[in-house]
Structure formats: structure tokens, C-alpha cells
UniProtKB/Swiss-Prot annotation:
Name of the featured protein: ATP synthase subunit delta
Keywords tagged on the record: ATP synthesis, Cell inner membrane, Cell membrane, CF(1), Hydrogen ion transport, Ion transport, Membrane, Transport
Family under the similarity heading: Belongs to the ATPase delta chain family.
Main location: membrane
Domain of life from the UniProt record: Bacteria
Membrane-topology annotation of the record: Peripheral membrane protein
Gene coding for it: atpH
GO cellular component: plasma membrane; proton-transporting ATP synthase complex
PANTHER family the record matches: ATP SYNTHASE DELTA CHAIN
Species of origin: Acinetobacter baumannii (strain SDF)
Zinc recorded as keyword: no
Record carries keyword Cell inner membrane: yes
InterPro entries with a match to the protein in the record: ATP_synth_OSCP/delta_N_sf (IPR026015), ATPase_OSCP/d_CS (IPR020781), ATPase_OSCP/dsu (IPR000711)
Transmembrane segments: none
């Protein structure tokens, strides 16, 4: 997964830089989401990756998927990906693109994993603290994961704050076995 993200990052950065320059970040975002969904579809992906399809034919297939939403720039981007055998990276490129778009809008997407459901008040307190820490607007999504036993794990981009009982027990176990 990290390997795919490493390969996808330069493509996402280039797409975002171009889209920002053209004032078309939302159009590119929509196109990348559609393309990402298409690549993740098993039947479409199997057909797309047939050996007899040239990169140009693969781009034509995506043109049919996007329809009117495909600009010349998106077509050129797809050609670049197809020529370098990187179409499989589209989901990672789309995710990285969205992250760049959020950062540009001074917004951070945060996932809070909690052992128990959070009350609205707890969620708001965490959101306020995270907005202060990241100095930007925070969009929070909460996931309940009972295996954490107690506490929370906060994920914001590539940063992780793990204050779960599971993590503390793992650290204790490591120290005892050392």
C-alpha cells in the first residue's frame, strides 16, 4: 500500500498543480473519483487490462467512462499513466489528490477510532483541540473499534496519535519481553 502511494504521489501532485493553475480542481476531483471507481470495478479492470489493449485503447475506454467530463488535459494525463503502466494507481492518485485539495483549502480530514461511541460533546471537544493543533479546519469522522479496549486513535494524513489501551498494553508487553 505504501509503495503504491509512493508511486502515486508525484502524479497526484502534478495533476493538482495543473488543475490549480487552470482553476479546475473540482472538475479534476470529479474525474479522478469516477476513474478511480472504474479501475476498482472488477469487470472493467479485467477488460481494461487485457493484453491486446494498447495504452491508446485504454485511454479511449476511459473516455467512454468519463463522457463529456473528459478534457484534453485529463486525456493527456491518462495517456501518461497508460504509457507508464500506472492506471492501477488511479485510486491512490485520487486519494492523494483529495488530500492535497484539502490541504490547499486549509482543511484536514481526521479519522478518530474509538473503543466506544463518542458523544457529540466529546467529538466537539476533540475537534476543537485538533483544529488548534493543526491550525486549520478539521473534518472529523468517527469509527468505533472495540478491539482498542479503551481510548482513541487519531489519524490525520500520515500522522497518528495512538492513545488506546491496546497500544499501551502492546508497549508494556514489548518492555516485559525485552
Amino acid at each position: 500500500m505504501a509503495e503504491l502511494l509512493t508511486l502515486a504521489r508525484p502524479y497526484a501532485k502534478a495533476a493538482f498543480a495543473y488543475a490549480s493553475e487552470q482553476g479546475a480542481t473540482d472538475n479534476w476531483s470529479n474525474a479522478l473519483q469516477v476513474l478511480s471507481a472504474a479501475v476498482q470495478d472488477e469487470a472493467f479492470s479485467a477488460y481494461l487490462n487485457r493484453p491486446e489493449h494498447t495504452p491508446a485503447e485504454q485511454v479511449k475506454l476511459f473516455a467512454k467512462v468519463l463522457g463529456e467530463d473528459q478534457s484534453q488535459a485529463v486525456s493527456n494525463f491518462l495517456t501518461l499513466l497508460a504509457d507508464n503502466d500506472r492506471l492501477v494507481l488511479l485510486p491512490e492518485i485520487a486519494a492523494e489528490y483529495e488530500q492535497l485539495k484539502s490541504q490547499n483549502n486549509n482543511n484536514v480530514d481526521v479519522v478518530i477510532e474509538s473503543a466506544f461511541p463518542l458523544t457529540a460533546e466529546q467529538e466537539q471537544l476533540l475537534k476543537s483541540a485538533l483544529e488548534k493543533r493543526f491550525n486549520s479546519t478539521v473534518t472529523v469522522s468517527v469509527e468505533v473499534k472495540p478491539e482498542l479496549i479503551a481510548g482513541v486513535v487519531i489519524r490525520a494524513g500520515d500522522q497518528v496519535i495512538d492513545d488506546s489501551a491496546l497500544n499501551k498494553l502492546e508497549k508494556m508487553r514489548t518492555r516485559l519481553l525485552a
